């Protein structure tokens, strides 16, 4: 078997390879290249599951980054157990062929209990007193102290939130990505896995925060180019063949679409008041949209209104398509976790999870970075609220409260969805905005389906 390192450069598309990315540009000239017709939806968990199983969501079950669990009547996002992926993974097949095969998963998702030999993934600790401590989960457990001794603590605050992709007291703009790259090199030196899956998220932040056309993105491109170049040199020196790919491309957006507010105004969303704030009671709602970037899985608990829901969503500005049962079968999205209907935004639009009509009644978690409690993806977590005078001083005050043992809310996130300037999830109209794959080995076509990446990776290992 050949030894392979898969460098997952999140958000990279052909549109970004140029003067600001000399290493990637040279690679694009020398290596074989293909565009990837993006996963549906083109989001992290679905794309990775397509790549690592060779199956579509109808088989592997990862219909988005999160979904409505009908048995619990709860929306659950960003879960970590690999048992959620309901199809064999590439390491299962390759290990069955040769027991000597080993795999490291460095920050790819569904990274707990996966069967990979070494895993590292972000995982805070939550003591019973309500506090939160940034940390990572590793398998084996002894990997965690060894990595932290070699690299220091993982700069979690720079992995997601207002400090991600910007210079801050928490670290350099690319601190999280550099730490992950360092962990991939450490794993290679210590264990030499056959397949090393490396997640490099740096571009993801400002492409969403500022938009892919913003001039400041040039600095992000230079930073990721340097990180990738260093990894290419490192792996080449050790006889490891790199493959570079991305999960999706990010396109400019200017219109947030608030489906749950529309549903609420029609009486379809049931609201529960708690301590003067409003929470959605999804199990008692007639319809609710589970928003994930440019895709929304629409749960319809009252079958008698499904046609009306579809009509209302299709008439909503910013909505491109609404898929029903027949469409889901064709697209490989016919799975029990999918919504009864699936809405796809126009390329310049994206879906919020917002259900409140008055910001004063928004739930407390809305103004926090809280990826698990929110019933949908929230890119506004990348911003500090511009309405808060001296927001950074407020953060310092909150951190002091935490250090003194007081409970506190890090409520510094705005509720203005118009701040977001880039998104993904829909299929971009231009292939220049599609994900890509670069390899020293010949690729089977100039354009690959997302499920065909599996075969490329398997062939690279098997030779």
Can you say where each PLM-predicted feature lies in the sequence?
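Beta-strand elements within well-structured catalytic alpha/beta cores of enzymes
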Residues: 2-14, 27, 51, 94, ...
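Glycine-/proline-rich flexible loop or hinge segments
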Residues: 5-9, 29-35, 43-49, 66-79, ...
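His/Asp/Glu-rich, glycine-adjacent segments
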Residues: 55-211, 223, 285-290, 294-301, ...
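Glycine-rich tight-turn/loop motif centered on a GG-T
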Residues: 213-221
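Short, solvent-exposed loop/turn segments at secondary-structure junctions
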Residues: 11-14, 41-42, 57-58, 108-113, ...
């Amino acid at each position: 078997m050949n030894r392979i390192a898969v460098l997952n450069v999140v958000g990279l598309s052909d549109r970004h390879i140029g003067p600001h990315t000399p290493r990637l540009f040279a690679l694009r000239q020398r290596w074989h290249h293909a565009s990837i017709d993006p996963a549906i939806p083109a989001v992290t968990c679905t794309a990775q599951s397509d790549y690592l199983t060779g199956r579509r969501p109808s088989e592997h079950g990862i219909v988005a980054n999160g979904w409505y669990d009908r048995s619990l009547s709860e929306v659950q996002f960003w879960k970590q157990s690999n048992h959620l992926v309901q199809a064999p993974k590439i390491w299962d097949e390759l290990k069955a062929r040769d027991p000597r095969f080993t795999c490291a998963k460095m920050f790819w998702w569904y990274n707990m209990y996966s069967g990979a030999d070494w895993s590292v993934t972000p995982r805070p600790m939550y003591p019973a007193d309500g506090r939160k401590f940034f940390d990572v989960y590793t398998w084996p457990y002894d990997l965690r102290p060894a990595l932290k001794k070699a690299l220091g603590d993982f700069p979690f605050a720079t992995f997601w939130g207002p400090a991600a992709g910007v210079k801050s007291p928490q670290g350099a703009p690319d601190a999280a990505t550099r730490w992950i790259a360092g962990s991939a090199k450490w794993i290679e030196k210590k264990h030499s896995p056959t397949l090393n899956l490396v997640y490099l998220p740096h571009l993801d932040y400002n492409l969403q925060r500022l938009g892919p056309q913003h001039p400041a993105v040039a600095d992000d491109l230079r930073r990721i180019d340097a990180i990738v170049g260093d990894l290419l040199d490192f792996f080449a020196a050790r006889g490891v063949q790199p493959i570079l790919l991305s999960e999706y491309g990010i396109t400019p957006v200017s219109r947030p679409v608030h489906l749950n507010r529309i549903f609420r105004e029609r009486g379809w969303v049931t609201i529960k008041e708690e301590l003067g704030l409003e929470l959605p009671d999804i199990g008692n709602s007639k319809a609710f949209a589970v928003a994930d970037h440019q895709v929304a899985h629409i749960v319809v608990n009252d079958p008698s209104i499904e046609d009306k829901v579809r009509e209302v969503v299709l008439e909503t500005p910013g909505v491109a398509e609404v898929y029903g049962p027949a469409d889901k079968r064709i697209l490989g999205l016919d799975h029990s976790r999918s919504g009864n209907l699936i809405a796809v935004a126009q390329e310049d639009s994206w879906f919020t999870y917002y259900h409140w009509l008055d910001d004063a009644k928004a739930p407390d978690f809305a103004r926090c970075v809280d990826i698990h409690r929110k019933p949908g993806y929230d890119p506004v977590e990348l911003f500090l609220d511009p309405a808060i005078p001296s927001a950074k001083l407020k953060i310092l005050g909150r951190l002091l409260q935490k250090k003194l043992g007081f409970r506190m809310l890090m409520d510094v996130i705005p509720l203005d969805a118009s701040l977001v300037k880039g998104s993904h999830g829909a299929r971009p109209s231009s292939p220049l905005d599609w994900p890509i794959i670069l390899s020293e080995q010949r690729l089977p076509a100039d354009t690959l389906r997302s499920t065909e990446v599996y075969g490329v990776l398997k062939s690279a290992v098997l030779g």
